Design a protein with these regions (language model features):
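Active-site-proximal segments of metal-dependent phosphoesterases and phosphodiesterases across multiple
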Residues: 262, 268, 283-324, 342, ...
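Core catalytic region of metal-dependent phosphoesterases/phosphodiesterases
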Residues: 155-216, 316
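Active-site neighborhood of phospho(di)ester-bond hydrolases with catalytic His/Asp-centered motifs
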Residues: 140-143, 174-180, 184, 205-211, ...
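Acidic, histidine-bearing metal-coordination/catalytic regions of metal-dependent phosphoesterases
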Residues: 19-147, 392-418
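Extended active-site neighborhood of metal-dependent phosphoesterases/phosphodiesterases
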Residues: 96-105, 113-127, 131, 189-277, ...
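Bacterial N-terminal signal peptides
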Residues: 8-16
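Acidic/histidine-rich helix-loop elements
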Residues: 60-98, 139-159, 229-237, 264-268, ...
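An acidic-aromatic substrate-binding cleft motif
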Residues: 99, 123-178, 183-184
């Protein structure tokens, strides 16, 4: 009897140790290519912790009676290991980051439906929502909060911005980010800390790789793999950009997500633009939205930036809305076609988000360029916090800029052209 009790005790102890080791971290829900029926999850577990399982069901399944489970695909990730970084108290250190990357695509889901899930032995319940089949949905659009554990207030400012919009407008269907959500993308501890915030546990996220997300401290290493390994985006990009550049359909809207860091050269730009043309040709949609990190215009003066590189393609392909960031100043046009403003029946609305970290904003300066194109500029100076709401119907997309208190600063409507 004593031997049986001892064996039972050891078995329970071993199970407890395994369960503890399998608690996931850096968990995020990303969109699937068809966001109405597919979700893609990404999380990390410790080396040697064994297989990892996600259990999910409808959000209103109170007792988890109809739970389903799926095992993750696993691979060792070492891209962040030994990278020079900083601790939350500002001390220099090298990241100790070797872990198992777990990825999972869940398909055959019900459109427009809220689900809940948990992973392994973790008692944290997280949520995601599939896109509707019609075009009635809402998203918040945010960028440039440069999460940096020694200055936690940056992340707090951005998360509070999301909370303010949530309180005023109700829960959104997804969060779109336009890059630079991390100060140094190579600092794994920054990603891990950021993903512990509530919006990462209750929303689906879709974003683009920013220059800060792409770099380690001091630009010692620059790679899109920091972004790729902390997300599980659709693998429908082009060579070298799988899981970084991608596209997805949300309702009746086609989103195309770009990586500026691969488009510095003429050949890199041509490669990206060839892919964009193919995606648009093969994925007919009511609205077409393109997102990249670098700004269309320099908001402080109005001078052209990426607008000059993309306007011809957008005109030819019928892009409805172009969203960018990076400049930390909000700027917005009405619909533009062939370099002039239209009545909205054709052309692209260009918009770029302000920063949201209350620390790294830019002040407006004399408006010297593109006064006939840019309709609105906004900044609070160095301490700027703002974000957009994007509301969709079958007839239009409505973009609204909000300040940190939720006040509406600017609004634009993108008309349906198809």
């Amino acid at each position: 009897m004593k031997n049986c009790r001892y064996i039972l005790f050891v078995a329970i102890f071993v199970v407890a140790i395994i369960a503890q080791a399998q608690v996931p971290y850096t968990v995020i829900a990303n969109v699937g290519e068809d966001a109405s029926t597919t979700i893609r999850l990404n999380w990390h577990t410790d080396e040697g912790s064994g297989e990892s399982v996600c259990r999910y069901t409808l959000a209103d399944d109170v007792n988890w009676e109809y739970v389903k489970e799926a095992k993750a695909r696993q691979e060792l990730c070492t891209i962040f290991d030994s990278i020079y970084s900083k601790t939350p108290d500002g001390k220099d250190f090298y990241e100790d980051a070797r872990f198992i990357r777990n990825t999972l695509e869940i398909s055959s889901l019900t459109p427009g439906t809220q689900y809940k899930y948990y992973i392994d032995g973790d008692n944290t319940v997280r949520y995601f929502k599939t896109a509707p089949t019609n075009n009635n949905w809402t998203a918040t659009v945010i960028s440039d909060f440069h999460a940096y554990t020694p200055i936690a207030s940056r992340t707090s400012a951005a998360m509070n911005m999301l909370s303010t919009l949530e309180q005023q407008r109700g829960e959104f269907d997804m969060v779109l980010h336009v890059g630079d959500i991390i100060a140094w993308g190579g600092s794994y501890s920054f990603w891990k800390s950021l993903y512990e915030n509530s919006p990462f546990k209750k929303y689906v996220w879709a974003g683009v790789n920013g220059n800060h997300d792409n770099m380690s401290r001091g630009y010692a290493l620059q790679t899109n793999q920091f972004f790729a390994n902390t997300n599980n985006n659709p693998l429908n990009g082009y060579d070298g950009e799988m899981g970084v550049c991608y596209h997805f359909t949300y309702g009746n809207t086609l989103f195309i997500m770009l990586n500026n860091e691969s488009m510095a050269s003429a050949s890199g730009l041509n490669k990206a633009q060839k892919w964009v043309r193919e995606v648009i040709a093969n994925n007919p949609a009511r609205f077409i939205v393109v997102m990249e990190h670098y700004q269309w215009f320099y908001g402080e003066s109005g001078k052209s930036s990426q607008y000059d590189r993309w306007k011809t393609l957008f005109d030819e392909c019928g892009v409805d809305l172009a969203i960018a960031a990076n400049n930390h100043i909000y700027a917005r046009t009405n619909a533009l076609y062939d370099g002039v403003e239209t009545d909205g029946a054709r052309g692209t609305v260009y918009v770029q988000t302000p920063s949201s970290d209350n620390e790294r904003g830019q002040a407006l300066k004399e408006w010297t360029d593109n006064k006939s194109l840019i309709k609105s500029r906004w900044s609070e100076g160095g301490k700027t916090v703002g974000a957009l709401m994007l509301n969709a119907t079958n007839e239009n997309l409505t973009i609204t800029l909000h300040d940190r208190n939720g006040n509406v600063i600017d609004t634009a409507v993108v008309k349906c052209k198809r």
